[in-house]
Amino acid sequence: MSTLLNRLTLLVSFAFSALCLQAADKKPFGLMTDLIEHTGQTWQNGYASNLPVWQLEEAIEPLQYAAIRSSHPAFSWIVPGETGGTRQTAYRVIVADNREDAASGRGNLWDSGVVGSDRSVAVRYAGEALKPGKSYFWRVKTVTNTEGESEWSEVKAFRTADRLSEYETAYYPQVKTMEFPVGITEIRPGTRLVDFGKDAFGQLVLTLASDGTRDSVVVHLGECLEGGRILRDPGKSTIRYHRYPLALLKGTHTYRIKIGKDKRNTGSAAVLMPAYVGEVVPFRYCEIEGYEAPLTPASVVRETVHYPFDETASSFRCSNDTLNQIWELCKYSVRATSFSGIYVDGDRERI
């Protein structure tokens, strides 16, 4: 009897899930404002925060978000439909200055009405100019040639910048990802070479222990190896190398390596890093010299700085390993170098 009940429960669960998925497919999804998808998300110093953008005033510490900089932004969405050849024939967009009205299907700022059109990209807001530094809410429903009228989409929130123009490109804040070594090698007693596997712009965070007999270590950061050690003198090339002495406190402590100023990329014409991120340097390898205690991957962290990047948005795989490696190199290069623009090398394009 219990087995039968379990099976019935499982069948009901599957049926409910299928209905939910079917219902979800009938709503427009993938809503974007000025081509930014995650407009309701906030970040704190590079890491995602749990506070939604419409509760920004409740934050004690500064938060970052993808500010919409246009007084008349454009809305985009993905048209729902399970049938091949599904085409949108009409849409209706509403915009409200509060979540409750939007959730109830009321656009107290703008209601486009039913517009006969197949357009689902860059539908421009046509209400009164939005105000700076405020949160807004919108949603859309569509009519298609195969499914008829859809349900309302989920409510999408966005927040405007402190200064607005008729049109200005919106963008995400820079974010951080914690990365751990793929290998730690003891070069000689007291000296370890840490390899993060790939080069990246970032900062180094170390958790080290000292019994008080050793008061300092030396940290080397670099992009290239020579003879199994980090290349100390890359000459006039754009390969980077940095050396940082680190004084140790007695006990176990976490240290953030302060990146030194480089005259080549911190001049008056340089693209400066935002204060909530701090300075970064490109490196793949780290050498820790003069440290006798055990060193684990968890105690050496690279905080990689990059523009938000969806690893699942594209993929490629074929029978040719060389082509696969070229694809991965190109994909990683976009992620690693696009936080302030597309770079030819480590630092040249931000000078």
Label every PLM stretch briefly.
Residues 1-12:
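Bacterial N-terminal signal peptides that target proteins for export
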Residues 13-22:
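Hydrophobic h-region of N-terminal signal peptides that target proteins for export
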Residues 24-348:
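Extracellular/oxidizing-compartment recognition motifs
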Residues 351:
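Active-site core of glycosidic bond-cleaving carbohydrate-active enzymes
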